[in-house]
UniProtKB/Swiss-Prot annotation:
Source organism phylogeny: Bacteria, Pseudomonadati, Pseudomonadota, Alphaproteobacteria, Rhodobacterales
GO cellular component, one term: plasma membrane
Descriptive protein name: Tetraacyldisaccharide 4'-kinase
PANTHER family with a match to the protein in the record: TETRAACYLDISACCHARIDE 4'-KINASE, TETRAACYLDISACCHARIDE 4'-KINASE, MITOCHONDRIAL-RELATED
Biological or metabolic pathway of the protein: Glycolipid biosynthesis; lipid IV(A) biosynthesis; lipid IV(A) from (3R)-3-hydroxytetradecanoyl-[acyl-carrier-protein] and UDP-N-acetyl-alpha-D-glucosamine: step 6/6
Length: 333
């Protein structure tokens, strides 16, 4: 499902569609508040760092979780990620094994994260954190658990796409938010805004006055793998929260983007779909390229035919964010 364009209107001028849907947005916000108030959070004997967002859809949580996991491991931790496993069939808690699990079972994000840390899929997030702690985690990264009241958190990071900000500031379906900005940030410890300098300036201008917690800025940058994208003809496809950002990155790298296919977030990459894309790429004389997250959903027969453009987080104040992480999760002795 594509997000309506009016979700990205200026908060001061949300549009008639948003105003029409505002009563439903208020009901959604109240339902979220009631669910959060009824929560009885479980505490585990290791620190829990939550990485979530206020917006529905993709804001960059997965690369943020990867960055956090790598820094915690560098500090001597044994980080485990606990995630719901969106799109997967397994209820869990189950420890993800990329050698035997498929995206249809555990979801695409857990398979990607499993390259950087131990990962647990659990529809019951509290049970997942208990399983991770029992299996030897020294710190738990709770992926997309900000609106989940079942687990006590030691540090809550709200990730936001700086270019999109918090949209028109309204709750679903009047806007993109899972809960109002003020109430959400009241539970947060930090906002991590992802975007280039222009997007960061725009975010501060629009939302700076609403930020009640520290702001750290970062940007997603292509990982240097030796691939020369300059003038490379490509047919790009992406089933992530913000496919346009992926296509812009390819253009910025100099790729000759012959065609861009925006898929729904987590859309299955069926053999029929991939055969169509392969045929179109052949007609265009283009190389198929996708994101790391989409690549884990590729049918086996197509994995050698598609290349990826991996991205990694570059944090402007890396030492500051590392210090915040280690204050919440001191390194083990």
């Amino acid at each position: 499902m594509r997000a309506p364009e009016f979700w990205q209107n200026d908060p001061a001028h949300p549009g008639w569609q948003s105003r029409l849907l505002a009563p439903l947005g208020a009901l959604y916000a109240r339902a979220t508040a009631r669910r959060l108030a009824k929560g009885d959070p479980v505490s585990v004997p290791v620190p829990v760092i939550c990485i979530g967002n206020l917006n529905a859809g993709g804001t960059g949580k997965t690369p943020s979780a990867i960055w956090v996991a790598e820094r915690l491991r560098d500090a001597g931790h044994e980080p485990h990620v606990v995630t719901r496993g969106y799109g997967g069939t397994l209820e869990g808690p189950v420890q993800v094994d990329p050698r035997r699990h498929r995206a249809e079972q555990v979801g695409d994000e857990p398979l990607l994260l499993a390259a950087f840390a131990e990962v647990w899929v659990a529809k019951d997030r509290a049970a997942g954190t208990r399983a991770a702690a029992a299996a030897g985690a020294s710190v738990i990264i709770l992926d997309d658990g900000f609106q989940n009241p079942s687990v006590a958190k030691d540090l809550s990071i709200v990730v936001v796409d700086a270019a999109q900000g918090f949209g028109n500031g309204r709750c679903i379906p009047a806007g993109p938010l899972r809960e109002p900005v003020a109430t959400g940030l009241a539970r947060a410890d930090l906002v991590l805004a992802l975007g280039d300098a222009q997007a960061q300036e725009q975010f501060r201008d629009t939302w700076g006055a609403a930020l009640s917690v520290p702001l750290v800025t970062a940007e997603l940058k292509p990982l240097r793998t030796g691939m020369d994208w300059a003038a490379t003809p490509v047919l790009a496809f992406a089933g992530i929260g913000n496919p346009a950002k992926f296509f812009r990155t390819l253009r910025a790298e100099g790729a000759d983007l012959r065609r861009a296919e925006a898929l729904d977030d987590h859309q299955p990459l069926t053999p029929a779909l991939m055969t169509r894309l392969e045929n179109e790429a052949r007609l265009l004389g283009a190389q198929l390229v996708t994101t790391e997250k989409d690549a884990v959903r590729l049918p086996p027969a197509f994995r050698s035919k598609v290349i990826t453009l991996p991205v990694r987080l570059e944090v402007a104040e890396e030492d500051r964010l590392r210090a915040i992480l280690l204050a919440a999760a001191p390194p083990p002795p």
